[in-house]
């Protein structure tokens, strides 16, 4: 006569916590497995992306119209002429960090209209 699943469940339910721990250890040894929890992979990464509220705007390249890009950078960052020029010439460089998505998209649009290559991270 074979044991049914229901009988196994009833038998485990009747065990004490220490007996269950010993049973798990014996099963791990018998079947060569571990009862450790499996880490969540892609689902956890997807949740992290959804929760992102701060973005960085990175100047990747200046394009053909360097003067217009410098003006756009000055207007967006409040830097002086020399600082804005140095920042533009050091591309790729972070222009603003930790800003909202709307602000990041507006800044990206303004810089792209000036001829710059921009990335929002």
From Swiss-Prot:
Question: Which keywords describe this protein according to UniProt?
Answer: Ribonucleoprotein, Ribosomal protein
Which source organism does the UniProt entry give? Answer: Serratia proteamaculans (strain 568)
Q: Could you name the Gene Ontology cellular component terms for this entry?
A: cytosolic large ribosomal subunit
InterPro entries noted in UniProt:
Ribosomal_bL12, Ribosomal_bL12_C, Ribosomal_bL12_C/ClpS-like, Ribosomal_bL12_oligo, Ribosomal_bL12_oligo_N_sf
Official protein name in the record: Large ribosomal subunit protein bL12
Keyword Ribosomal protein annotated: yes
Which gene is the coding source of this polypeptide chain? Answer: rplL
Stretch forming the signal peptide: none
Named from the GO MF annotations, one term is: mRNA binding
BP GO terms, sorted: translation
User: What family does the database annotate?
Assistant: Belongs to the bacterial ribosomal protein bL12 family.
Its subunit composition reads: Homodimer. Part of the ribosomal stalk of the 50S ribosomal subunit. Forms a multimeric L10(L12)X complex, where L10 forms an elongated spine to which 2 to 4 L12 dimers bind in a sequential fashion. Binds GTP-bound translation factors.
Q: Which Pfam families match?
A: Ribosomal_L12 (PF00542), Ribosomal_L12_N (PF16320)
């Amino acid at each position: 006569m074979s044991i049914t699943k229901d009988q196994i469940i009833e038998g485990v339910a009747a065990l004490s916590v220490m007996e269950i721990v010993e049973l798990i250890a014996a099963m791990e040894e018998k079947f060569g497995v571990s009862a450790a929890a499996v880490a969540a992979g892609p689902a956890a990464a997807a949740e992290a992306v959804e929760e992102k509220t701060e973005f960085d705007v990175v100047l990747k390249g200046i394009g053909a119209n360097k003067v217009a890009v410098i003006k756009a950078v000055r207007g967006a960052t409040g830097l002086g002429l020399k600082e804005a020029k140095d920042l533009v010439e050091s591309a790729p460089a972070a222009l603003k960090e930790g800003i909202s998505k709307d602000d990041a998209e507006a800044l990206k649009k303004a810089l792209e209209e000036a001829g710059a290559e921009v990335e929002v991270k």
